[in-house]
């Protein structure tokens, strides 16, 4: 084989060796671009416009509000009242951030605020609620996470707005803040109250 032929073969073999690396780098760049472009609060929910899932969660043992035990949570809780369901956990850092806002929101008597405690130890959940104040009229313990999966929860915190008819009207992914409350959640609550 001539020197020119060997050089061409060597060049082709280098290209063939580099081709998978180039393809991998292109796919990795595309993945990172799409990952950064997404807004997690805009994750779709197939449950919007549908009735709440059927579930029955036990109460957090020993949890009280105003000297009375806080009941567990089931789909029957949502009939007849505009309700915010907050999925939370004591180990969730953004849940700590939103807890004071939820306590403030619980004073709005037009809505009821309930919670699902997600994959948490009861002692930790109680300590969390006693630290920040318990905003919930009912809180279900979802230690295995099955009910949260039925709700389509991606991670905590997530908040669902349920109308008086027991149908899910809106879903907010991430912590409730004063800004996203006034911009998105409050208008949805006002619609549900009409």
Where are these predicted regions, by residue range?
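N-terminal targeting signals for export/organelle localization
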Residues: 1-62, 194
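Thiol/disulfide oxidoreductase modules built on the thioredoxin-like
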Residues: 14, 130-135, 141-193
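Hydrophobic beta-strand core positions in alpha/beta domains
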Residues: 84-86, 115, 161
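Conserved redox-active cysteine motifs that mediate thiol-disulfide chemistry
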Residues: 87-104
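Conserved segment of the thioredoxin-like fold in thiol-based oxidoreductases
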Residues: 105-144, 156
């Amino acid at each position: 084989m001539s020197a020119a032929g060997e050089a061409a073969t060597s060049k082709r073999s280098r290209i063939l060796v580099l081709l998978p690396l180039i393809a991998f780098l292109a796919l990795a760049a595309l993945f990172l671009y799409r990952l950064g472009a997404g807004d997690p609060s805009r994750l779709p929910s197939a449950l919007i416009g549908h009735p709440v899932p059927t579930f029955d969660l036990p109460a957090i043992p020993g949890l009280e509000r105003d000297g009375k035990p806080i009941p567990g949570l089931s789909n029957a809780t949502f009939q007849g009242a505009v309700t915010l369901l907050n999925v939370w956990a004591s180990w969730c850092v953004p849940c700590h951030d939103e807890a004071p806002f939820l306590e403030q929101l619980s004073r709005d008597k037009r809505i009821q605020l309930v919670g699902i405690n997600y994959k948490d130890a009861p002692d930790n959940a109680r300590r969390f609620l006693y630290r920040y104040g318990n905003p919930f009229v009912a809180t279900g313990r979802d230690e295995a996470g099955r009910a949260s999966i039925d709700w389509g929860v991606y991670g905590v915190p997530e908040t669902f707005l349920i109308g008086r008819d027991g149908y899910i009207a809106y879903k907010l992914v991430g912590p409730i803040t004063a800004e996203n409350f006034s911009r998105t959640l409050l208008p949805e609550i006002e619609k549900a109250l009409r």
